[in-house]
């Protein structure tokens, strides 16, 4: 495994561990998810460029489209929760609470 792949994999792992550790606030969770998506995008792009996969060249762009949709939905959920409850705690997303 080259150092480029190792660094990208470590960035993904750090983002995933951050998602597991800092899941009390919605903004922290969204930032960790964006870090994971960015590392996946870079990994896919580097793999496609190194292996000359011409048929899979649209996959990173499709991943970016899904990442943008995820970010838009996450930020709209953040605005809705912060307007309703006044905080951005993930525990406020539980619909079973009264």
UniProtKB/Swiss-Prot annotation:
Q: What is its main location?
A: mitochondrion
Q: Coiled-coil intervals in this record?
A: none
What EC class is this?
translocase
Q: State if GTP-binding is listed as a keyword.
A: no
Q: How does it sit in the membrane?
A: Multi-pass membrane protein
Q: Which InterPro entries has this protein been placed in?
A: NADH_UbQ_OxRdtase_chain4L/K, NUOK/Mnh_C1-like
Query: Per the UniProt record, which residue ranges are transmembrane?
Result: 1-21, 29-49, 61-81
EC number in record: 7.1.1.2
* Source organism, top-level taxon: Eukaryota
Q: Which family does it belong to?
A: Belongs to the complex I subunit 4L family.
Under the subunit heading, UniProt states: Core subunit of respiratory chain NADH dehydrogenase (Complex I) which is composed of 45 different subunits.
Q: What name is this protein filed under?
A: NADH-ubiquinone oxidoreductase chain 4L
Q: From which source organism is this entry?
A: Eumetopias jubatus (Steller sea lion)
UniProt lists the gene as MT-ND4L
């Amino acid at each position: 495994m080259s150092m480029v792949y190792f660094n990208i994999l470590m960035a993904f792992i750090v983002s995933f561990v951050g998602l597991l550790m800092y899941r009390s606030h919605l903004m922290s969770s969204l930032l960790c998810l964006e870090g994971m998506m960015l590392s996946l995008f870079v990994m896919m792009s580097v793999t496609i460029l190194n292996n000359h996969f011409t048929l899979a060249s649209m996959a990173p762009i499709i991943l970016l489209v899904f990442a943008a949709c995820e970010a838009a939905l996450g930020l709209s959920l953040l605005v809705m929760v912060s307007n309703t409850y006044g905080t951005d705690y993930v525990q406020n997303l539980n619909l079973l609470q009264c």
